[in-house]
Amino acid sequence: MKQQPLLGFTFALITAMAWGSLPIALKQVLSVMNAQTIVWYRFIIAAVSLLALLAYKKQLPELMKVRQYAWIMLIGVIGLTSNFLLFSSSLNYIEPSVAQIFIHLSSFGMLICGVLIFKEKLGLHQKIGLFLLLIGLGLFFNDRFDAFAGLNQYSTGVILGVGGALIWVAYGMAQKLMLRKFNSQQILLMMYLGCAIAFMPMADFSQVQELTPLALICFIYCCLNTLIGYGSYAEALNRWDVSKVSVVITLVPLFTILFSHIAHYFSPADFAAPELNNISYIGAFVVVCGAILSAIGHKLLPHKNH
């Protein structure tokens, strides 16, 4: 693989910005459209676009191989559909900056599953990173502990957000197994098609007609975001080291906070400012530091000589 650091960084940054801005746009659409319908449109547009691309490149997955991996693909579809639905639903109860802080639970969930299923070893840097993640989350929610005392609107949103991040691990593990026979784009195509089929009975297509001009713009962006985010992510991995791309991706929650402030500044009537105190901002930074340490800590911490 030819290294192109500048292009790799650019695509990784586009990915982080796309994923960071997504919940802000989603929240606008959710005021008119239910989560199932939004998710179906996102999946079907991504699936059709990717199908056309792979057909043009003559790289469509072989049917025989697809049948061999049907059960694994089903697990992945369940994980991805649940992730999209739970994350979108959480925005009905909590603000985007809170929903996005849980994104790193997915990567740590993958690490733990790697230890339990594939017998991989958890490095010291990953253990410290996990510790920082927990500390950071505690700081982030420093003024919200009372909200977790019972099942209320806020705690419901948090439960949905955490559930969405953790269930994504099922997709991540399925993808890891399927990479033995398919490339990443072929896997995404199969997952997108499977998810679109799963959500079709639940989608209410008439809700598109009820979108306001702002909600329509946000809706179109949400649909394109899947292609922009995952497409840029794939291009970044083709041009730059995985560990370096991962570091940039850890900035997603910070971009969500930044974009929330920018959106509120330009249109306070439509976009709410993040309700975070100074300790919460520190907590968000600590969460990101924990994720960065987990991604590249092996290069920062001294190795033992054997």
Curated annotation (Swiss-Prot):
Q: Which residues cross the membrane?
A: 6-26, 35-55, 69-89, 98-118, 122-142, 154-174, 186-206, 211-231, 247-267, 281-301
Q: Which GO terms describe its cellular component?
A: membrane; plasma membrane
Main localization of the protein? membrane
List S-S links within the chain.
Answer: none
Q: How is this protein positioned relative to the membrane?
A: Multi-pass membrane protein
UniProt keywords (A-Z) are: Cell membrane, Membrane, Repeat, Transmembrane, Transmembrane helix, Transport
Q: Which InterPro entries match?
A: AA-Vitamin_Transporters (IPR050638), EamA_dom (IPR000620)
SUPFAM superfamilies in the cross-refs? Multidrug resistance efflux transporter EmrE
Asked if Repeat is a keyword of the record, the answer is yes
Locate the EamA domain: which residues?
Answer: 17-142, 166-296
Q: Where in the cell is it found?
A: Cell membrane
Q: So which domain of life are we looking at? A: Bacteria
Write down a Pfam family by its short name.
EamA
Q: Which family does it belong to?
A: Belongs to the EamA transporter family.
Task: State what protein this is by name.
Answer: Uncharacterized transporter HI_0878
> What taxonomic ancestry is recorded?
Bacteria, Pseudomonadati, Pseudomonadota, Gammaproteobacteria, Pasteurellales
